[in-house]
């Protein structure tokens, strides 16, 4: 249930950087043109050429190292349904994101929309957590180290944007306005250290319960987590998109 931040960072890389002019980026990136009838395949090839460089990062593109991917903080507040809790995750580190497979890209240039399908074989996550609330009517409280392993992850994302004219330059820019994501995790294993003030009996029982019911828990938390990641994604991506005109990011 902690995978979305990692996934959307990679979606940002895919959609935001693969088509910047060569004079502004390293030569290993392929330029894609929006009038290319094979634009979707071009983007896929661009991503493949970028993949080896993601592990260590690309300073010239302001892409940080992605192995591990570091996310400073995520907060989740859920008050409706069978899960009612507040949780905070800090110092998040995720391994395995650069092993993603971009299965398909479908661009709709006229409507400023991109649809992506990805597959992630495995993600491993470590973070400091703080949680307090109830899960399926059972109380849960604790803070400490959270660890998670997620495998066979299928992701579908639809990123919606719009064009606007810069008041400073008069040039046309692009910004993300919304996105939809649906992900399916084949299997998950999570462990929260120091639950219930270190009571090993209660802690072991809760971790067993979470792993036995991880699909139910993930389904309940998913909307709140998606909203959180959506705002992070839009804020971060638009800071980057605002620097380049559309004709630079995706020339005709």
Annotate each language-model stretch with its function.
Residues 46-54, 58, 210-214, 218, ...:
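Sec/Tat-exported extracytoplasmic proteins
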Residues 68, 72, 143, 224, ...:
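Residue-level signal for alpha-helical context at structural boundaries
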Residues 1-3, 251-252:
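A positional/structural detector of protein chain ends, strongest at the extreme C-terminus
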Residues 19-26, 231-252:
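C-terminal helix/juxtamembrane-tail motif
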Residues 10-13, 111, 141, 202:
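N-terminal hydrophobic alpha-helix used for membrane targeting or insertion
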Residues 170-226:
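Extended amphipathic ligand-handling, pore-lining, and cofactor/metal-binding catalytic surfaces
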Residues 3-22:
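Cleavable N-terminal signal peptides of Sec/SRP-targeted secreted and luminal proteins
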Residues 21-186:
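Hydrophobic-cavity lipid-handling domains and compact docking modules
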């Amino acid at each position: 249930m902690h995978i979305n931040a990692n996934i959307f960072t990679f979606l940002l890389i895919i959609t935001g950087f693969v088509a910047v002019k060569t004079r502004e980026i390293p030569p290993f990136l392929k330029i894609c043109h929006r009038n290319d009838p094979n634009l979707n395949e071009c983007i896929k090839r661009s991503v493949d050429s970028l993949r080896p460089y993601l592990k260590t990062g690309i300073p010239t593109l302001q892409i940080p190292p992605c192995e591990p991917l570091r996310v400073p903080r995520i907060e989740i507040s859920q008050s409706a349904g069978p899960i009612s809790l507040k949780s905070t995750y800090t110092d998040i580190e995720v391994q395995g994101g650069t092993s993603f497979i971009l299965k398909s890209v479908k661009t709709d240039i006229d409507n400023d929309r991109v649809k992506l399908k990805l597959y992630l074989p495995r993600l491993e996550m470590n973070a400091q957590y703080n949680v307090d609330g109830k899960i399926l009517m059972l109380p849960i409280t604790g803070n400490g180290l959270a660890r998670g392993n997620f495998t066979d992850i299928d992701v579908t994302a639809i990123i919606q944007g719009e064009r606007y004219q810069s008041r400073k330059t008069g040039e046309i820019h692009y910004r993300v306005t919304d996105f939809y994501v649906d992900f399916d995790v084949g299997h998950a294993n999570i462990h929260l250290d120091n639950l219930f003030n270190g009571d090993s009996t209660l802690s072991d029982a809760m971790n067993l319960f979470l792993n036995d019911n991880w699909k139910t828990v993930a389904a309940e938390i998913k909307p709140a987590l998606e909203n959180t990641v959506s705002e992070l994604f839009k804020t971060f991506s638009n800071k980057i998109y605002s620097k380049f005109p559309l004709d630079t990011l995706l020339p005709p």
